[in-house]
Amino acid sequence: MLQPKRTKYRKMHKGRNDGLAWSGNAVSFGEYGLKATAHGQLTARQIEAARRTISRHVKKGGKMWIRVFPDKPITKKPIEVRMGSGKGNVEYWVAQIQPGRMIYEIEGIPEDIAREAFRLAAAKLSVTTTFVTRTVR
């Protein structure tokens, strides 16, 4: 599962996930990409599940890039614990996603296989996505 090796601080403020993706919004590495069309958070588990789905569908062919990394810790208090006594422990890690953000890229396979692989992977993700093709080489 993806998570940072070390961080400066263990816990993070909730923050706001506004605006559009100004960086990481173009197909930079591969031929085809899976692009987010809504705000949301992708957990490390979701990213890994979608990666496995893509890998299984394309089998040996092609090369894949994961363009997001879960670097935000999400905390949770244990069940049946009273309020107060500080912030809970880190439960899992998420990547914050804005509309336009490229999530996965792939190359070296036909478009129909890439489209189907991304369709199957999109079912594992909590944000709506669209299939995009590289415009300029």
UniProtKB/Swiss-Prot annotation:
Alphabetic keyword roster: Ribonucleoprotein, Ribosomal protein, RNA-binding, rRNA-binding, tRNA-binding
Matches recorded under PROSITE patterns: RIBOSOMAL_L16_1, RIBOSOMAL_L16_2
InterPro entries referenced in this protein's UniProt entry, alphabetically: Ribosomal_uL16, Ribosomal_uL16_bact-type, Ribosomal_uL16_CS, Ribosomal_uL16_dom, Ribosomal_uL16_sf
Record bears the keyword Nucleus: no
One GO CC term, this protein: cytosolic large ribosomal subunit
A Pfam family that the UniProt record links to this protein: Ribosomal_L16
MF annotations from Gene Ontology: rRNA binding; structural constituent of ribosome; tRNA binding
CDD domains to which the protein is assigned, alphabetical: Ribosomal_L16_L10e
Quaternary data: Part of the 50S ribosomal subunit.
Family in the record: Belongs to the universal ribosomal protein uL16 family.
Protein name: Large ribosomal subunit protein uL16
Source species of the chain: Xanthomonas campestris pv. campestris (strain ATCC 33913 / DSM 3586 / NCPPB 528 / LMG 568 / P 25)
